[in-house]
Amino acid sequence: MKLPALSLVVTWCLFLTACSTSQKDFRPDRKYAPEQLKKDYRVFRGVLEAWHPSLYWYTSRDSMNYYFDRGYSQITDSMTEPQFRTILSYVIAQVDCGHTSIRYSKAYSHYLDTARLRQFPLILKFWPDTMVVAANLNRRDSVLRRGTPIASINGRSPRQLTDTLFPYIVTDGYNLTGKYQYLSTGLHFSSWYKELLGYTDTFEIGYLDTAGVLRQTRIPIYDPRGDTVRRSLGRSLQPGTVQRGPGPAQRMRSPGRRARKRRELLLTRNLQVDSASHTAFLTLNTFEHGYHLRAFFRHSFGVLAEQHVRNLVIDVRSNGGGDASLSTVLTRYLIDKKFKLADSLYAVRRHSRYDRYINNGFLYSFLTFIASSRRPDGKYHFGYFERHYFRPYRNDHFDGQVYILTGGNSFSATCLFAGALKGQSNVTLVGEETGGAYYGNTAWMIPDVTLPETKVRFRLPRFRLVVDRQREKNGLGIQPDVPALPSAEAIGKGLDFKTARAKELIRLHSSGQ
């Protein structure tokens, strides 16, 4: 979630001051001396203690001091960057803030983006006590197909694996749905399995066959350098090519910049209307700038009014947030009463002795000076959002039935949107708990901090937000009104079970049930 209006200024200034990292002398296996690591760790702790407004929101000061001391005590020998990052990740996860996370140095991130490294071969969908194959990188594997329940990996059950990995994964409060979704996304599970348990050349997999019988199989690690099938597919099916019978691929003209942008916009936000059922489906995967969302919302709700749409399904399952001003625009087309974004929104300081480690620290301090004022409690409050009420739009306001699809990737500004509408008589939240907290979060201005020796980075949110003091501060996300949970069968068949549940609710409502 970002600071409205000022975020474009931040982006432009970051662009002007950005610099590239030289890769000439980079070695991924480089080890840093204990003295270097301890220096970085002291900066890491000092910055968080000085700046983070929610360091003790969910974890007591005594407990955080214990975790800080524990991490420091683990630096007894030289370490590689991934080893040091693992220590930092464990400590920062105890803050219970989903916007505060560790990032590799720019050099190491570039290495990971370009290196073809070995990976755990299964992409898994996680939920409590369950792992199910969502994809298999070893394409020739005919046993562990999509939808296969996994009982164990090298003798470790789903519960044992998540108990091992979860302490290193950041989340808002005590939310576990976001952690399950994180492990289910991309190569996150593979990466943390490698760091904490280590890769082996083969993995012993316990799985359930189609009859529900527990069986065992052994699978090799996935090595992209030896995947001749994918290499051949990559040559023949790469963008801008077409295969015309035997022989090498024939290159066609690649799509132009405008065509690529149109495709990106379509994948990021789109509206589809089913005139037969008077139902519209709005997919929205971000609230970031750069996707013309204001114009998209204006056009979309104009279409809904023109076509007399009665049911609107809004899919924000993959929406990790963005600018709160844009989520507010969408909210105003749907909400039936005036609302505020914040009961309280504040930073704890404008300057500290650690400013030199904060990327563009002067700029962020300047923006904090402009946006906030000091109150008697000693905090720097963003008074506009604490006082201002937003009202529903009159033109093209949608008053039909609204179904909002949510899940573990629904985060930050998306939770402001869903939370503001939860409980409204014509709004139903369908799916899973959001990954972001219902009570509030810590975000708005989020610079990176770069540690001086290793150049490891971490995100430092500057403002604590409490949306509504009347909400329970239980560390959980926004709960769905109608749960729609995953199953091995749905994953195996590639079913969109949340959209299907929303359609069923529309049918029941239309028939008066």
Residues covered by each model-derived region:
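Generic N-terminal initiation segments characterized by hydrophobic and/or small/turn-forming residues
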Residues: 1-5, 11-13, 34, 264, ...
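Bacterial Sec-dependent N-terminal signal peptides
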Residues: 1-27, 44
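Conserved acidic, small-residue-rich alpha-beta core segments centered on
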Residues: 148, 324-491
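Flexible, low-complexity junctional segments that flank or bridge functional domains
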Residues: 20-312, 316-346, 438, 443-450, ...
